């Protein structure tokens, strides 16, 4: 399940994989859902879209359609959430869905000096509520993993600047058995 699926980039890539039986994308923006539908249809054709369900709504509230997924993805999403929404996302993803694996990516705030982000309050996008440093993201990820029974590893994504690190960072959460 792709929480905050946007225009369906990840879902379109995954939809072509014949070993994946079921995909769900969730986004609150109807234009994003429409874009995802088109992108996935272009990638796999009309028959391939049968295994993809797109939901217009919030992933901060429990929905039965979220259940039964092996993986939760939140790709460049958490930074768009206010603290109460972030807590709600964590509850839905890790307590309600409880997947075998979750993947969360977010910008590395330290890297912003490389991109000169002064016009957006030092952030990459005007809608970002926050951006975490590498240490902040690692601490948040470890806290979530410990609280919900997941082993966590955090890895860089993108070219690594010698001082500021990577542009983005990934936390992979594997549920303890």
Model regions: which residues?
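Conserved class I S-adenosyl-L-methionine
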Residues: 1-6
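Conserved SAM-binding loop of SAM-dependent methyltransferases across substrates and taxa
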Residues: 7-19
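S-adenosyl-L-methionine-dependent methyltransferase catalytic module, highlighting the catalytic core
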Residues: 7-9, 28-69, 73, 81-177
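Conserved SAM-binding motif I beta-strand of class I
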Residues: 22-27
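Hydrophobic adenine-recognition pocket in adenosine-nucleotide-binding enzymes
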Residues: 77
């Amino acid at each position: 399940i792709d929480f905050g699926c946007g225009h369906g980039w990840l879902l379109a890539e995954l939809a072509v994989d014949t070993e994946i039986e079921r995909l769900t994308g969730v986004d609150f923006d109807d234009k994003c859902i429409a874009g995802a539908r088109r992108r996935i249809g272009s990638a796999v054709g009309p028959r391939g879209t049968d295994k993809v369900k797109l939901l217009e709504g919030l992933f901060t509230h429990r929905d039965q359609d979220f259940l039964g997924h092996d993986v939760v993805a939140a790709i460049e999403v958490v930074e768009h959430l206010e603290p109460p929404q972030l807590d709600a996302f964590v509850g839905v993803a890790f307590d309600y869905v409880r997947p075998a694996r979750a993947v969360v990516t977010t910008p590395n705030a330290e890297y912003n000096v490389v991109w000169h982000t002064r016009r957006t309050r030092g952030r990459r996008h005007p809608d970002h509520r926050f951006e975490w440093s590498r240490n902040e993201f690692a601490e948040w990820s470890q806290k979530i993993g410990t609280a919900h029974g997941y082993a966590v590893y955090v890895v860089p994504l993108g070219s690594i600047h010698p001082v500021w690190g990577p542009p983005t960072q990934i936390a992979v959460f594997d549920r303890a058995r």
